[in-house]
C-alpha cells in the first residue's frame, strides 16, 4: 500500500507541481511551512469532526492550542535535534503517516478505497479552462467551483 500511496502522490505532483528532485533533499522553509499548513488544515477538520456546535469548535481549538504549546515546550526542553534536517523531516512525516493509519485501525476502517477516492478527486483539480489555479501565498492547487 505504501508504494501505491507514494506513486499516487508522485503522479499528482508530476501533473500539478513538477518539482520532484533528482536526489533526496530537505524541504526549504517556505515549502515546509506550506506543507505543515496543509497538514494542519486537515488536522483541524479531523479535530472538529465530532463537533455539532460552534461552542464545541471553539473548545476544540482551545485544546489544540494547549497541545501545541505543550509540544513546543517539549521541543524547547529536549534541545535541538542533532540528526540531518532531511532525516528529521522524513521521520516526522513517517510518524504522521503511521499515526494516521493507527487512527484508521482504531476506527476499524480500511483506508484503501478512501485514499483512492481522494487521489482520483485530486487529479480532477483542473479548472474548466484546462489550467491549474494556485493559492497566491501557499502555491496550493485550488479546487474548481464544481469540485
Q: How should each PLM-predicted stretch be described?
A:
Residues 1-147:
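Flexible "arm" and connector segments at domain edges
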Amino acid at each position: 500500500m505504501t508504494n501505491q500511496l507514494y506513486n499516487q502522490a508522485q503522479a499528482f505532483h508530476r501533473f500539478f507541481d513538477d518539482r520532484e528532485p533528482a536526489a533526496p533533499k530537505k524541504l526549504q522553509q517556505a515549502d515546509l511551512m506550506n506543507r505543515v499548513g496543509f497538514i494542519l488544515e486537515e488536522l483541524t477538520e479531523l479535530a472538529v469532526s465530532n463537533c455539532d456546535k460552534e461552542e464545541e469548535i471553539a473548545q476544540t481549538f482551545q485544546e489544540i492550542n494547549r497541545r501545541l504549546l505543550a509540544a513546543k515546550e517539549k521541543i524547547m526542553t529536549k534541545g535541538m535535534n542533532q540528526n540531518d534536517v532531511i532525516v528529521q523531516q522524513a521521520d516526522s512525516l513517517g510518524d504522521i503517516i503511521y499515526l494516521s493509519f493507527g487512527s484508521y485501525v482504531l476506527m476499524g476502517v480500511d483506508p484503501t478505497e478512501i485514499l483512492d477516492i481522494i487521489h482520483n478527486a485530486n487529479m480532477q483539480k483542473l479548472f474548466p479552462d484546462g489550467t491549474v489555479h494556485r493559492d497566491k501565498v501557499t502555491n496550493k492547487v485550488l479546487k474548481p467551483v464544481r469540485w
